[in-house]
Amino acid sequence: MEKIFIFFVLFIYTYSLEPQPLNDLDIDISKFEVASKTNQIILVIPPEYNTTNATLYFYVKNDNKWVKHTETDAYIGRNGLGKLKEGDKKTPVGVYKFNRYFGINPNPGTELPYIQVNESHYWDGDSKSKNYNTLVNYDIYKDFNTFDSEHLIDYNPGYEYALNIDYNKEQTPYKGAGIFLHCFTNNTYTAGCVAIKNTTLEHLYTIINEDCHIIIDTKENMTRYYYNHSLLLYINIKMFMFIFFLLLL
């Protein structure tokens, strides 16, 4: 009985070492693993996995302090979070960067390599194409299925301004393509992208730099992206196994 009690106490102790889920949005941005790599972090936080509404927060580091610059309503995938494959209408969770900047409207004032799309531009959604999940110009490259791709200029409202979230940057076939941060459409959901108000994205475009990171998940899961989460979890498992075998002696 004494061994069982000791085992229980030590189990509770080791579990307590792991960062616990947040109960509010008072998030310590400096604890994110990517906080040392950037001075800009976007959080997209829905209230739960199976919802289409979310809140986008944009944080900027000034004088070594993280300050909330923007908070705005957002929409995510029609089937919520947890994208796994092409066409599942879900928004991916995790930490990402932006790797393409484009829109139907003229450059809003960014120094990023912005492309104002025209009739020739597509987002290649053909899993058999060598340029899968990239922006292509049909005048230059035609070896892809346009039916499986997005003719970008047709998405208005929506793609007045857009940034590609680098989900599936490895271009794994059928894993999914074209996950953007873009403007609101006429729907209260997306096909897997993140959508915010047109004027808000236009403003953010003038601030966002190439090192900006975006983290997408529920608030309860935000500690997963803290710099010490993986290490603490590893230590906890090792300690638990050590204690377990020690008590068996």
Where do the protein language model's features map onto the residues?
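Boundary at the C-terminal end of the N-terminal hydrophobic targeting segment
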Residues: 14-19
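C-terminal GPI-anchoring signal of eukaryotic secretory precursors
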Residues: 227-237
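Cell wall/extracellular polymer interaction/catalysis modules
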Residues: 20-191, 201-224
